[in-house]
Amino acid sequence: MRLGIDIGKVIINGPAHPEGGDTAFFTGDTARLLRTPSMPGAFETIARLVTLFDGRVWLVSKCGERVERRTLQWLAHHDFAGRTGIPPDHVRFCRRRPDKAIHCAELGITHFVDDTLDVHEALRGLVPHLYLFGGHQSGPEWLEHTPTWASVEEAITATFAGTPGERGR
């Protein structure tokens, strides 16, 4: 089994920036960018999921080149690799949301966490376990709504119950 995780509004909590929201991450200077907090519980939960998935965890994000550079700066500044166990070469970017499906197919992703419904629609039928992250009221019945990192961990861990031989696939 293999896990894919979006970055913006799933790991990086742009809307909670101390200086007033998402735009500080996208348009502010480097110091403002680096002050953008992570989502509550993200680093700790992801570290446990990396162990559960035996290191088979990737970040897959849609953004332009500038935001890609800023995202990599943020991840490095917050020691994301050291704190979670996800190495820098397990971070992938694409320019269009539906293109996340290309990365998921190449990597054999079986579980994916994203806050955007259209990404899940692109992954439907390709990735068996889809988790809609964040404060959405609801989503289609073919995906699981996970408003917090605690609920993500609970939902994903439940898929491992009774399948110890499946972990390496």
Regions found by a protein language model. Give the residues of each.
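Short acidic, S/G/P-rich loop/turn micro-motifs used as interaction or catalytic elements
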Residues: 11-12, 65-66, 119
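Short coil/turn segments at beta-strand junctions that form active-site/ligand-binding loops
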Residues: 1-2, 55-56, 110
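Conserved short-loop catalytic and cofactor-binding motifs
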Residues: 30-33, 59-63, 88, 92
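Active-site neighborhood of HAD-like aspartate-dependent phosphohydrolases
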Residues: 1-40, 44-48
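C-terminal cap/substrate-recognition subdomain and adjoining C-terminal extension
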Residues: 68-169
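Short, flexible active-site-adjacent loop segments at beta-strand->alpha-helix junctions, enriched
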Residues: 15-17, 63, 97, 136
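Substrate-recognition element of Asp-dependent hydrolases with the DxDx(T/V) motif
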Residues: 42-75, 94
